[in-house]
């Protein structure tokens, strides 16, 4: 059953990533039209930028993501014995190599995994998580992260993060340049003889500038929700004790948001680190629903 869930999750994620690439191309077309009056140039530029972002993130994702989230690497068990040994044990059970281990200095309990593949992965936990979780709860959380590593969710998340960052960059460039630089020229061109097609393309381009970041967030949300349910099930399988993760999720659900977190990395965490802050899209399923699914296992 779990194998079937993993395969289904991979198929859905492939579809979502394909939609993501299409969105990058559409944003590129919009930026190209606004800045250069060329849809084709914009599409090519967007694909190149998206590819560069993806290559950079995939090849160096751990260092980039940990720097964005202020993670400090621990090199041996003496620095954080409980966390180190829990990661070591869960990696052994999941039959994946021991990942690099990081600690984030934040009182809010949370954790995430990142990397390119099980051979190049990392797990981070906040100081708040280590303070409030007992042994079985910590095992449940770390097993959840090991499931992300084992299922290659970390690579998918890295690619999605890179594409979302590329879309943000493109829309910022297009919006700022058009509105503050060439906007007057463009509007004058439209008034002085722009036909219906030009007006339609202009409206499309402006709408893309506004809606593309929201669409990117929605796709990230869908990818993240698929990952979280599957990783919860994987945690229960690895620990053979779903109650540990259930208890941990209850504590996570009552926690305050993290003080200093990179918003583009929010989908990586086991629990939404931006909770109680206004967000149009939530990258995580409701805690209550996750607990309900675990209790039925």
UniProtKB/Swiss-Prot annotation:
Its cofactor is Zn(2+). Binds 1 zinc ion per subunit. One of its GO terms (molecular function) is metalloendopeptidase activity. It comes from the Bacteria. Zn(2+) binds at residues 144, 148, 228. It is an enzyme of class 3 (hydrolase). GO terms for cellular component: plasma membrane. It holds the Pfam family Peptidase_M48. Keywords: Cell membrane, Hydrolase, Membrane, Metal-binding, Metalloprotease, Protease, Transmembrane, Transmembrane helix, Zinc. Its EC number is 3.4.24.-. The active site is at 145. It is a multi-pass membrane protein. It is found in: Cell membrane. GO terms for biological process: proteolysis. The chain crosses the membrane at residues 14-34, 38-58, 159-179, 199-219. InterPro entries: HtpX_protease, Pept_M48_protease_HtpX, Peptidase_M48. Belongs to the peptidase M48B family. NCBIfam families: PRK04897.1 (NF003425). This is Protease HtpX homolog. It comes from Leuconostoc mesenteroides subsp. mesenteroides (strain ATCC 8293 / DSM 20343 / BCRC 11652 / CCM 1803 / JCM 6124 / NCDO 523 / NBRC 100496 / NCIMB 8023 / NCTC 12954 / NRRL B-1118 / 37Y).
């Amino acid at each position: 059953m779990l194998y079937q869930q993993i395969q289904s999750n991979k198929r859905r994620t492939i579809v979502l990533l394909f939609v993501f690439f299409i969105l990058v191309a559409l944003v590129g077309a919009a930026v190209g039209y606004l800045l250069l009056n060329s849809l084709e140039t914009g599409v090519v530029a967007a694909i190149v930028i998206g590819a560069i972002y993806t290559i950079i993130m995939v090849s160096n994702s751990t260092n980039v993501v940990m720097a964005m989230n202020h993670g400090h690497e621990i090199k041996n068990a003496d620095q954080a014995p409980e966390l180190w040994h829990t990661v070591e044990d869960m990696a052994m059970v999941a039959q994946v190599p021991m990942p690099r281990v990081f600690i984030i200095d934040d009182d809010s309990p949370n954790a995430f995994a990142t990397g390119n593949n099980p051979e190049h992965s990392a797990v981070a936990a906040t100081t708040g998580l280590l303070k409030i979780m007992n042994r079985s709860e910590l095992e449940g959380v770390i097993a959840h992260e090991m499931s992300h590593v084992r299922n290659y969710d970390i690579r998918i998340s890295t690619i999605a993060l890179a594409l979302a960052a590329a879309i943000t960059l493109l829309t910022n460039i297009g919006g700022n340049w058009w509105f503050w630089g060439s906007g007057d020229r463009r509007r004058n061109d439209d008034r002085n003889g722009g036909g219906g097609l030009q007006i339609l393309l202009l409206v499309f381009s402006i709408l893309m500038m506004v809606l593309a970041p929201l669409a990117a967030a929605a796709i990230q949300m869908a990818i993240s929700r698929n990952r979280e349910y599957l990783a919860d099930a994987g945690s229960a399988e690895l620990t053979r004790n779903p109650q540990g993760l259930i208890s941990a999720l209850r504590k996570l659900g009552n926690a305050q948001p993290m003080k200093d977190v990179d918003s583009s990395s929010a989908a990586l965490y086991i629990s939404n680190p931006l909770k109680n802050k206004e967000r149009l899209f939530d990258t995580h399923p409701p805690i209550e629903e996750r607990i309900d699914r675990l209790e039925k296992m």
